[in-house]
A protein has these predicted regions:
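Short secondary-structure boundary/capping segments within folded domains
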Residues: 19, 31-34, 159
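Solvent-exposed loop/turn segments connecting transmembrane beta-strands
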Residues: 14-29, 47, 78
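Predominantly the C-terminal beta-signal and adjacent terminal strand-loop region
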Residues: 122-173
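A short local loop/turn or secondary-structure capping micro-motif enriched for an aromatic residue
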Residues: 22, 48-51, 136-137
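Cleavable N-terminal export/targeting peptides
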Residues: 1-10, 173
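Extracytoplasmic loops and strand-loop junctions of Gram-negative outer membrane beta-barrel proteins
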Residues: 10-13, 52-54, 96-99, 148-154
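Gram-negative (and chloroplast) outer-membrane scaffold detector with strong preference
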Residues: 32-129, 168-171
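Surface-exposed strand-loop-strand hairpins of Gram-negative outer-membrane beta-barrel proteins
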Residues: 20-22, 54-62, 148-158
């Protein structure tokens, strides 16, 4: 008696809807199921926007490009239910003028831990909820305002930041 290989949904493409509220940060994640309980992922975030450029006193931005790779552990099975994740991440950033007149730019390298829940809406559409934090080192330069260019500090510092507050829409292939 011959058996046919079973079909399983192994690939998903998702976007975090809450990232768009962060001054228009575009984002995408690709996940691939490597076993019943493990998936690997790669993600990117990009925000090129600067607001009120014509008025240095009112200018603000949350510009970034960020790249991450990681893995998720699914206690039940991939692409549905609770999950726990770890990621390695690189971020080039420039933010300022939001909470204070200062602006900071630099590069961050780090790792993060995350947890969440994935709810199946249909056989191909999932809704993901999750949160986490990441920590690492930042090579930075701080300016007195977003546009003036006067350096007030620079160097290396360690950070621990909240990350990936997410409500994501995922399409499962």
């Amino acid at each position: 008696m011959a058996s046919l290989p079973s079909y399983a949904q192994k690939l998903s493409l998702s976007t975090n809807l809450l990232d768009y509220a962060c001054l228009g940060t575009m984002n995408a994640d690709v996940s691939y199921s490597v076993s019943r309980r493990w998936s690997v992922m790669a993600g990117v975030r990009y925000n090129p926007f600067t607001f009120n450029e014509d008025d240095p006193q009112e200018q603000f931005q949350m510009r970034q490009q960020s790249y991450a790779v990681g893995a998720r552990l699914w206690p039940w099975h991939t692409m549905s239910g609770w999950w726990f994740a770890g990621k390695l991440r690189y971020q080039e950033y420039n933010h300022g003028g939001i909470l204070s007149p200062e602006s900071e730019e630099g590069d961050r390298f780090g790792a993060g831990l995350y947890a969440g829940y994935t709810y199946m809406l249909t056989s191909h559409l999932n809704l993901e909820f999750g949160t986490g934090f990441w920590s690492g080192v930042s090579l930075y330069r701080t300016y007195s305002c977003p546009k003036c260019g006067k350096t007030i500090d620079h160097g290396r510092k360690y950070f621990l930041l909240p990350d990936d507050l997410m409500i994501s829409l995922a399409y499962v292939f």
